[in-house]
């Protein structure tokens, strides 16, 4: 029997790398999607994952990603971890940069979610997980270009969950409230950042939840974070 496939869109260091390692260890065939796959070389060598050059804001590119994943086995899990962002005062922020952030962070989530849903509906089970942030529910000064795609992604996840839960497809949205530990850097304050390995464990646990008690929205933050 072919291994189940997990697609991670927006792959890079940090959370995506932790997910790739964990899912590989748990027996998944991992497919990593990124605009620049060269940066994934060491992770691919470590995990045996397939890296596919992908523009998540391009329908044809996302379709090609999932066609490549189809050749690896049946899709069981899709994680959208891509993020479009730009910051700056509302009177000064670059409109083109905001448009690109929306294309990557919200429209890209739709394209990945759509391709995943088609396959999981045909299979009759599986999970689609979206990575959000505190900006998914709260707009901060100077962050319109980040809040807009994150609000949009959350709305997408809500709509998909209400449509797909009754069809045995688990859709979940994660609010990452805080900074994820950067690779190779110690936080200035102990416990002030989220461990990417710990987040990955929560994603996997959510995927494996019994369908009598599915989560939709999961908030994750360091225990010292004020909220």
Tell me the role of every PLM-derived stretch:
Residues 4, 74-76, 89, 120-133, ...:
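Active-site loop of short-chain dehydrogenase/reductase
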Residues 26-42:
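Conserved glycine-rich Rossmann-like NAD(P)H-binding loop of the short-chain dehydrogenase/reductase
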Residues 12-13:
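Conserved glycine-rich cofactor-binding loop
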């Amino acid at each position: 029997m072919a291994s189940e496939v997990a697609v991670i869109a927006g792959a890079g260091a940090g959370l995506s790398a932790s997910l790739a390692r964990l899912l590989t260890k748990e027996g998944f065939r991992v497919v990593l999607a990124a605009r620049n796959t060269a940066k994934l070389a060491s992770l691919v060598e470590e995990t045996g994952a397939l890296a596919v050059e992908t523009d998540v804001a391009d329908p044809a590119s996302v379709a090609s990603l999932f066609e490549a994943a189809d050749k690896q086995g049946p899709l069981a899990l899709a994680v959208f971890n891509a993020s479009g962002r730009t910051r700056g005062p509302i009177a000064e922020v670059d409109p083109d940069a905001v448009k690109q952030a929306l294309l990557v962070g919200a429209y890209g989530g739709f394209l990945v979610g759509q391709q995943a849903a088609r396959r999981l509906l045909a299979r009759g089970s599986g999970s689609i997980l979206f990575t959000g942030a505190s900006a998914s529910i709260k707009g901060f000064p100077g962050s319109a270009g980040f809040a807009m795609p994150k609000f949009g992604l959350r709305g997408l996840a809500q709509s998909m969950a209400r449509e797909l839960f009754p069809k045995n497809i688990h859709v979940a949205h994660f609010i990452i409230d805080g900074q994820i530990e950067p690779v190779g850097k110690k936080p200035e304050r102990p416990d002030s950042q989220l461990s990417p390995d710990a987040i990955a464990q929560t994603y996997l646990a959510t995927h494996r939840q019994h369908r009598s008690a599915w989560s939709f929205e999961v908030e994750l933050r360091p225990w010292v974070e004020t909220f």
